């Protein structure tokens, strides 16, 4: 058995932001995404709001300014190495959609119960207010292997 219980793929269940007793959903209550941890110390996360509109064009680097703005404000992505420390994990960000995160280390506090994972952030600014993120994940079902 792998001594690191984070290894694998996890599917987002909820992404909440807490400020005192106030709870908000920065990407909506129907946000979706995945976080993945590899056995050799790499991680990546992708989270998006539900119901994102398609661009009018099929040019992957195209889109109107309005389309790009909407897409950017409804998506979170970063990747890099990580360090598992039992009660917390440190994400050492090497690539990120939000450029200010590149080169930073982000702490996430861990609560793990079977195939359910809760990652909690220290306070950070979300929509102009200091909030703590709470991201609930469930282990993704193993993909069927082709015969």
Question: What does each of the following model-derived ranges do?
Answer:
Residues 1-147:
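Lipid interaction determinants
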């Amino acid at each position: 058995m792998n001594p690191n219980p984070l290894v694998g793929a996890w599917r987002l269940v909820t992404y909440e932001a807490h400020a005192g007793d106030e709870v908000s959903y920065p990407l909506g209550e129907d946000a979706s995404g995945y976080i993945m941890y590899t056995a050799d110390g790499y991680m990546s996360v992708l989270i998006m709001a539900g119901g994102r509109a398609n661009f009018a064009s099929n040019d992957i680097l195209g889109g109107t300014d309005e389309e790009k703005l909407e897409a950017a404000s409804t998506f979170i992505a970063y990747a890099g190495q990580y360090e598992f420390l039992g009660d917390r994990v440190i994400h050492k960000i090497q690539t990120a959609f939000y450029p200010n995160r590149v080169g930073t280390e982000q702490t996430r506090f861990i609560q793990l119960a079977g195939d359910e994972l809760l990652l909690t952030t220290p306070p950070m600014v979300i929509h102009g207010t200091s909030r703590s993120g709470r991201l609930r994940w469930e282990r993704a079902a193993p993909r069927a292997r082709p015969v």
